[in-house]
């Protein structure tokens, strides 16, 4: 059954003559009227290295679409660089920007009645924001990312952005060494080179099914990334005609991003030790899709999914470019499939099922295509380079070692349960999140006295002033979605703990969140948060916090009676109850509006209206 183009409302008939005049002024040719209008939802900005090359990408995708007879029009969303926004009040704006991005995409597509869209994303909040919008709009959509940055290299040792932060805070590292690390940590355009939030989300998009194989792992500088852009352009044209000419709803986001797809994506996330932020984002995307996917699902998956991959920051041996050489995300999905841990009947945007994609793109498959083998041979250029798709280095061989290689089989997994876990207890009744892939197993059982701070800034001062010693549990409260507001990332506190060589001797727990670059015993997303009257707000200095990762528990060792007594005392503060009494932070109207509607992290920090 043929479906009328959405753009028909603004391009057809005598009454739309004025609108057509405006479209002509936008460059639309007469022969393009009554053809699909495909939006290029870009996120180019010169503030973010992961997005600095996307202007050329957008123009290239536009030209590829228009070669096939459609009209393509580009617009940009905002994009915040979490690394640059880190360590000051700019981080308060990062998570809220996810909703602004989703809203802006919805506004532009609905206002101009675009028929389909290609989403060109890359970094932390941009991919989830665009995914949230795609669920709301439910029009033909293809995602393609700008690609990851190459790993840095200093004297033969590979490194990334996190190494700069750690060494710069270490008093035993010379100024010259810090300068050299700074100069070499980020050598190219692209999203930072480890399994941080940006790369985690671009990898998960392959499992959700809205992005093509290689989306998350082919480096931004390689020419095969340009082929991926061309493939995305061709696919969106094909899928647009499938939907509007043939009524095929299988190409729509809500037909692809089903419960099975979210379970697959979360299983992948756990297996590869992705950023804890991905949990926040998957919950929010599922919420927009109307899919029943909760923290309980994540907890269940975390108990049966093995850890197959340890990429920086969880280990220093491998980076995203190494995942590509080992067969990319399809390689990990294939190993999960062999142990029946994912649903391979799930559909993908390219018309394949997950099973069919594995057969064609798994480098260990007997049916693997030549295209796939070439795709995963794409190597870094190993030089300073800010130009997208400008080098053609290839690996001589692929990494098919599933015993000791970058991607392991379930038989040779790093651990039987995976790289992410959900903990619950009397200070996290609705759950909290920990990236177990980045923790030394010797501290899976940990207890110690609480050192409580009511802001990230005060925690950083305390750590740098030597107020934290081995055995302590750093507790940072009032940094959740409401309490911040904005749920800051705690990368600097964790980096400072590492720089003082306390990474294996301390824990950090918070109702805030962590950068994808965080490792160590760092537990975030504590829900309900302090500002939502959560028990985490009742913890005081020197209370004993007990953490048991194998049992998935986190508790303050206080009786229910003591907690009830403290709650009563807190409520006696009236309107000031469950707010930080000593913190001086200016909160503008924009963030106050965000705080008034946002849920706790266990719901994905979504708006509750």
Swiss-Prot record:
Keyword line: 2Fe-2S, Amino-acid biosynthesis, Branched-chain amino acid biosynthesis, Iron, Iron-sulfur, Lyase, Magnesium, Metal-binding
Pfam families xref list: ILV_EDD_C, ILVD_EDD_N
GO BP terms, alphabetized: isoleucine biosynthetic process; L-valine biosynthetic process
Entry annotation: catalytic residues: 515 (proton acceptor)
Record GO cellular component, one term: cytosol
Record EC number: 4.2.1.9
Cofactor note: Binds 1 [2Fe-2S] cluster per subunit. This cluster acts as a Lewis acid cofactor.
N6-carboxylysine PTM sites in chain numbering: 125
InterPro entries: Dihydro-acid_dehy_C (IPR042096), DihydroxyA_deHydtase (IPR004404), DiOHA_6PGluconate_deHydtase_CS (IPR020558), ILV_EDD_C (IPR056740), ILV_EDD_N (IPR000581), IlvD/EDD_N (IPR037237)
Catalytic activity, as annotated: (2R)-2,3-dihydroxy-3-methylbutanoate = 3-methyl-2-oxobutanoate + H2O; (2R,3R)-2,3-dihydroxy-3-methylpentanoate = (S)-3-methyl-2-oxopentanoate + H2O
The protein's annotated pathway: Amino-acid biosynthesis; L-isoleucine biosynthesis; L-isoleucine from 2-oxobutanoate: step 3/4; Amino-acid biosynthesis; L-valine biosynthesis; L-valine from pyruvate: step 3/4
Residues that hold Mg(2+) according to the record: 82, 124-125, 489
GO molecular function list: 2 iron, 2 sulfur cluster binding; dihydroxy-acid dehydratase activity; magnesium ion binding
Enzyme kind, highest EC tier: lyase
Cofactor(s) demanded: [2Fe-2S] cluster; Mg(2+)
Positions that bind [2Fe-2S] cluster: 123, 192
UniProt-listed NCBIfam families: ilvD (TIGR00110), PRK12448.1 (NF009103)
Family under the similarity heading: Belongs to the IlvD/Edd family.
Functional description taken from the UniProt entry: Functions in the biosynthesis of branched-chain amino acids. Catalyzes the dehydration of (2R,3R)-2,3-dihydroxy-3-methylpentanoate (2,3-dihydroxy-3-methylvalerate) into 2-oxo-3-methylpentanoate (2-oxo-3-methylvalerate) and of (2R)-2,3-dihydroxy-3-methylbutanoate (2,3-dihydroxyisovalerate) into 2-oxo-3-methylbutanoate (2-oxoisovalerate), the penultimate precursor to L-isoleucine and L-valine, respectively.
Subunit comment: Homodimer.
HAMAP family: IlvD
Protein name (database record): Dihydroxy-acid dehydratase
